[in-house]
Amino acid sequence: MPLNNPITPALLADPEIFQQNRLPFHAHFADQTSPEMPLTVSLDGAWSFRYAENLTAPFSEWDTLTVPGFIQLQSLQKPGHPYGTPHYVNTQYPWDGHEKLHPGEIPQAYNPIGEYRRSFTLPENWASCYLRLNGADSAAAVWCNGVYIGYTEDTFTPAEFDMTAAIHPGENTLTVQVYRFCSGSWLEDQDFWRMSGLFRSVELFTKPEVHLEDVFVKQSFADDFSSATVTFDCKVSGAGTISVVFDGEEQSAEVGEPAEYDSGVVFGKGEADPDVEEDVQDVSFTFAVEHPALWSAEQPNLYEAEIALLREGALVERTGLKVGLRRFELKDRQMLLNGKRIVFKGVNRHEWSCRTGRTVSREEMLWDVQNLKTHNVNAVRTSHYPDDPYFLQLCDEYGLYVIGETNLESHGTWQKLGADGSDKWTLPGARPEWRENVLARAEAMLERDKNHPAILIWSCGNESHGGKTLWEMSEYFRHTDPSRLVHYEGIFWNREYPATSDMESQMYTPVADIKKFLAEHPEKPFIMCEYSHAMGNSNGGITDYTEYAYEEPLYQGGFIWEYMDHGIAVTEPDGKPGFAYGGDFGDRPTDREFCVDGLVLPDRRNTPKMDAVKAAYAPLKITLTDTEAVIENRNLFTDLNAYDLVFASSVNGKPERRAVLRADCAPGKTANIVFPFALPETGLACMTITAIQRAALPGITAGYEAAFGQVWHDHTTARLTLPAPQLVAMDYNIGVKGESFEYIFGRGKGLVSIRYNGVQLLDDTVRPNFWRAPTNNDEGCAEPFASAFWKTAGLYARCDNLTAEAKGEFVTVRANYTLPDGQTLPIDFAIDGAGRCDITMTWQGEHTELPEFGLLFPLRRELTEVSYLGLGPRETTADRTAGGKMGVWNYNVRQDFAQYTPVYPQECGSRTGVYSATVTGSIPGIGFAGDGMTFSALPYTPHELENARHLYELPRDDSKTVVRCEAFQRGVGGDNSWGAKPHADTCFAVEKGTSFRFMIQK
């Protein structure tokens, strides 16, 4: 079918042409039905599809693709990837280096077009037909039966078109062309995979003779919240009756007097169509509510509203709304929700599915919301565009505060290689040709999402510098919707219009610098719209930020970057499932694994980082002394009596006593509760208090553990004296043996053999170790360069001297190591008659910061099961112990590794605060004991992890088990991933005389 096609390269590149014939924006209606006919028909499913490299290139043969979906992701499933591949870049634009372009220009040689086509037949009784594209990346043009209908940009908000005049009886043909790049691509430089397609649902809809075009629900409250006034501002087309039912009361009005209505339909550059008028009428209904049930994340109370349209007394349309009553305001330089100072415990959330990209299923959205709720997250920033409306509906229902962010990021036009390089090309600034394009994006979001109580703040976009246009956007938000505040982080970079943002918002600022800023600039509340960069093994020091929110009233929390890794599910070269990141499809330029920076893995498995988030964001802070619990209730609206307080004592991880108490403590207050029984005084004695949710809440079941606190003391007594073992000193080796055990130390090598019950446990020689596999954060701050010596120091340490002495109950073997810089490191092995070996390594050099200080034990492959007494059940690090609970925990070495680095291998799997550990399997095992040491058991050495960039590049995971016992391992950091080191208190150092002592045993 030939198309009347007005789309040209010049049109696509022109920032002043961002829509043609697009209908006015309006609120999203989650439930709009008619008893007589369907009002909406989904066109999701299989569409005919063909592809061209650019506007002048020939199209491919017809194929079939699925809508919603991305062209490039579906192309991956076809031989040769005929429709291109996903392309990942962060700040730089995807055409950088391919074509020299400036804003107002777009790629010509490579600007792929995907042409979708399908037929449809109108349902009976439809007198009109409209098309809704809920998401088209990045621009789309529409034809019906070959007649040009319209054009739209702005990837993440709906575009609606009137196709009625082009419809004919019987079968109709709909064609949609999607363009990968347009002028709007300069405004959509978000940190994500660059792809194109119809990635959200496509729908047809009709309008009955009387129709609800729009509704805006507005609220006001008495000062003490004892009453509320709720107003429904409605726009209605056609003639008939409109009825609103709310809180048990019904109000109605007659409509039908024609009124001229600017439809917003645009032809060319802003020229309104003079022939378009509709009989749209404004009508309002106001309801009084006594003692309203207020909405909050803790108590997401929703009222049901129903708006009915009748024609000559017959119902023709019904719209359901859920209304949350809440007041959000800025008062005395603090943000208040329902009169209470709010603390945002948030995450940034890109829409993502590892198989379908930003086409996210409802099941995945529900999983996300429930997962956030059960990890004490109370807020989401929709980075950096409006989310699918269903996600916002879930936030309303389950209780999550939302920063709704405009689809705007021009990062690459001003930030060059990490520095502010703003110039005449910086967008949007005050450039008049971009003004309407930018402001329309704000209007589209506000109009669609204005009735969601979860949205507390409108954001002007992300990382788009500053200037007049952004200030005008903020003023639009305030004028149109004074019930919300306005956010924009970019004023940090450009203070020309500081009033653009109602709050100071920054990214990745250390707590110390936040304190300094607020001391000098206390004019506004402060939030971190991005902090604690979750790339790889990260999020160290996260609790510092949360604790500061309860010390400084002006600091009101922040949003972790980010919620989910953006890995793409693929089959790796070894035939196993895996995840791809930037560059894996040959995409260049690329920022490689920078898209893998989430708390949750691409397939929605939680990492141990989420354990720390849950603890840091807990609604209760529980601190224990030896005799009482001090519980700070950090809720805004929930009393402490909503929780059962479970007191449990244990010795060496074994339960002793248990009691359940309840206590009253108002939100914001603190309670002191004396232990119902004494802390034991034997072994590793521990008291644990857990706060258990008594009643179910949306997304949270009864019995949910909201918070916990612990205190423990080690009362371990001295061991019994036993006869010394036998010393066997020969020319090449020194042996120490006793009943059912034998240790052999090779001269020039060190500890080369451990046999228990006649079974060899070592796979290779035990060695000192000072190295960990670099994390993304390590690489970002050049730590491998700074510490490179310590990689070789352990690998090539030379055991120059071996001595042995039998004295008392011990045989002590000293292995004197020489490091590549010439310094010596003595390690003493004191072995008793039971086969227990006390190991002490003592630093002889000067003050030195090390990545790690300990010993590495390559064990036999059969030893795969770990049981330990320490912080668990999953990984903890020196700067991320929050969420780790003292107890006895068990794991399989290979299965444990799989949950940490399925995308980009790096250091992982450590356990801190370990007092004892056993590694067992199909052969007799080995035990380790220390005084709260760091312990890990992995299938790989740090060097093997470091050498791999994907899982398939690692050696087989069943060749050995690598145990490391450490005095310390440097913290993982996470203030950012491009220069920030871990905090000073977890950048550990040794000095002359520093020693590490632990024990191995049968």
Q: For the regions a protein language model found, what residue spans apply to each?
A:
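Extended substrate-binding grooves/exosites of carbohydrate-active enzymes
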Residues: 2-35, 70, 147, 186, ...
